[in-house]
């Protein structure tokens, strides 16, 4: 006599996905960070889009628009806090995910590890682009902190920083 969860078509899908999932015996909570990264990324994109609908980057009105988001937009303060803390949580999960890979020796799988390194560099490049380039909404402080190390290169450092910034667009409290 077979169990209904293994013979019924719909229950068989659930059984194979959740109950009899073919996973290694050493799986632990360390293996959740890839999924948590996806959740954090969806959270960042969705809250960022809603915040961008109400934010103005002009130096005279930027603070007022943030105040408007916090006071007048329904649950705007929640969006701000989720977006700010979601960014920190994203990078915590990212570093823990890399740390788990180092701990369990995943670097021995060269192709998989190289894809992960490329994704890490792409994440850092995307974070830079998100800070500096779109809509002129990032602060002068953020752009200078991220590119500060490049300015220490002799002879070409300042020109390299200006080239990465995209010219002289970085000169005020916000990039407009």
UniProtKB/Swiss-Prot annotation:
The protein, known as: Cytochrome b
Phylogenetic classification of the source organism: Eukaryota, Metazoa, Chordata, Craniata, Vertebrata
Co-factor(s): heme b
GO biological process: mitochondrial electron transport, ubiquinol to cytochrome c
Family: Belongs to the cytochrome b family.
GO cellular component: mitochondrial inner membrane
GO molecular function annotation: metal ion binding; ubiquinol-cytochrome-c reductase activity
InterPro entries membership: Cyt_b/b6_N, Cytb/b6-like_sf, Cytochrome_b_N_euk/bac, Di-haem_cyt_TM
Residues binding heme b b566, per UniProt: 97
Residues binding heme b b562: 83
Gene3D superfamilies hit by this protein: Cytochrome Bc1 Complex, Chain C (1.20.810.10)
Other observations noted: Heme 1 (or BL or b562) is low-potential and absorbs at about 562 nm, and heme 2 (or BH or b566) is high-potential and absorbs at about 566 nm.
Keywords: Electron transport, Heme, Iron, Membrane, Metal-binding, Mitochondrion, Mitochondrion inner membrane, Respiratory chain, Transmembrane, Transmembrane helix, Transport, Ubiquinone
Transmembrane annotation, as ranges: 33-53, 77-98, 113-133
Function per UniProt: Component of the ubiquinol-cytochrome c reductase complex (complex III or cytochrome b-c1 complex) that is part of the mitochondrial respiratory chain. The b-c1 complex mediates electron transfer from ubiquinol to cytochrome c. Contributes to the generation of a proton gradient across the mitochondrial membrane that is then used for ATP synthesis.
Assembly and binders: The cytochrome bc1 complex contains 11 subunits: 3 respiratory subunits (MT-CYB, CYC1 and UQCRFS1), 2 core proteins (UQCRC1 and UQCRC2) and 6 low-molecular weight proteins (UQCRH/QCR6, UQCRB/QCR7, UQCRQ/QCR8, UQCR10/QCR9, UQCR11/QCR10 and a cleavage product of UQCRFS1). This cytochrome bc1 complex then forms a dimer.
Source organism, top-level taxon: Eukaryota
Pfam families: Cytochrome_B (PF00033)
Note on cofactor: Binds 2 heme b groups non-covalently.
UniProt organism field: Corynorhinus rafinesquii (Rafinesque's big-eared bat)
Subcellular location field: Mitochondrion inner membrane
Membrane topology type: Multi-pass membrane protein
């Amino acid at each position: 006599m077979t169990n209904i969860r293994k013979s019924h078509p719909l229950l068989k899908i659930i059984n194979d996905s959740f109950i009899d999932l073919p996973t290694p015996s050493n799986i632990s909570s360390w293996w959740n960070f890839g999924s948590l990264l996806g959740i954090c990324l969806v959270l960042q994109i969705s809250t960022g889009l809603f915040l961008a609908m109400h934010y103005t980057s002009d130096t005279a009105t930027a603070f007022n628009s943030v105040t408007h988001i916090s006071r007048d937009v329904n649950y705007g303060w929640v969006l701000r806090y989720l977006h700010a803390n979601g960014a920190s949580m994203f990078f915590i999960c990212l570093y823990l995910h890399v740390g788990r890979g180092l701990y369990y020796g995943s670097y021995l799988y060269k192709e998989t590890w190289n894809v992960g390194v490329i994704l890490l560099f792409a994440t850092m490049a995307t974070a830079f682009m998100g800070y500096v380039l779109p809509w002129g909404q990032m602060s002068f402080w953020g752009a200078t902190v991220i590119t500060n190390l490049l300015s220490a290169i002799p002879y070409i450092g300042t020109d390299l920083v200006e080239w990465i910034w995209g010219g002289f667009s970085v000169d005020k409290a916000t990039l407009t």
